[in-house]
Amino acid sequence: MMGEYSLPEGYKAKIQVVVNPEQKTLKFIDNGVGMTADEVEEYINQIAFSGATDFIEKYKDKTNEDQIIGHFGLGFYSAFMVADEVHIDTLSWQSGATAVHWECDGGTEFDMKDGDRTEVGTTITLFLNEDVLEFCNEYKAREVIKKYCSFMPTEIYLSKENETDEEKKEELLNETLPLWAKHPNECTKEEYLEFYRKVFQDYKEPLFWIHLNMDYPFNLKGILYFPKINMEYESIEGVIKLYNNQVFIADNIKEVIPEFLMLLKGVIDCPDLPLNVSRSALQNDGFVKKISDYISKKVADKLAGMCKTEKEEYDKYWDDISPFIKFGCLKDDKFCEKMTDYI
């Protein structure tokens, strides 16, 4: 149940991305609850045209549940960065609702009238401008979706419009429950290794890993892998992928990830991270500093615990992990305090 709406038997939420190079369009089709004409008026006509500044001012004091990132209105507003024209076709779940068609060419005027959609949900069609036509190519669309949305919690399918029955296929592009979102006790060694190979395209087995799982005082999950380092032949280059609610944000955000951890490979998902601020603001954000300190502490705890309870393994790995530990001690005083007895 969703309000008064009974979901159809076997219902599974999904988003279809449909490319059409001939028409130069990109469609996003969902099977969600749709919108009434009044909701289009509120969420599109009022929010999307209120201006980014007014929108941010309106929502700056909202709680995490109402954070700006991921909010439909602001995301929709940005569609005009790539599209000369945008159409919306939607049908609400509400009994007796009439389908709505809305269109705008990027100015302040729009047209809204009864639509012809027959299934509950929403379709947004972008008529791409000449500078970004690459995005209606299925290969480019697949590349972008896989980079940013490989672990989104709703299934995403990609297809090409007007394909023949023989050609027609929907390709699932994402995993809705990434390994880092599971409890560590539910994960097997093979799952950790498979995830490492898939995300980092590295087929050399890592030495070990740390599964971060924290709900208080902030929400943070992730997995950090210690790769095997051959100092003679390889440079020490790691990568830490930062996610927000399972959506990829960027690699190696040094304002969030302690510098010495850049030698590792891993993923960090922190929905509480403020994304509507500049990189320079992140440097001076006390909350971000707490996140960074927590990550550093968990790594130190893991290494200290390994030295105490798995001394033989710790000694075996020492040649590989010593550059990381020594670098961490130089860069982070608290890390150094915790690791002094284990060097």
Which sequence ranges carry the predicted segments?
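GHKL (Bergerat-fold) ATPase N-terminal catalytic module, capturing the glycine-rich phosphate-binding loop
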Residues: 1-135, 143, 150
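GHKL/Bergerat-fold ATPase module in large chromosome/replication-associated machines
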Residues: 68, 86-109, 129-132, 139-343
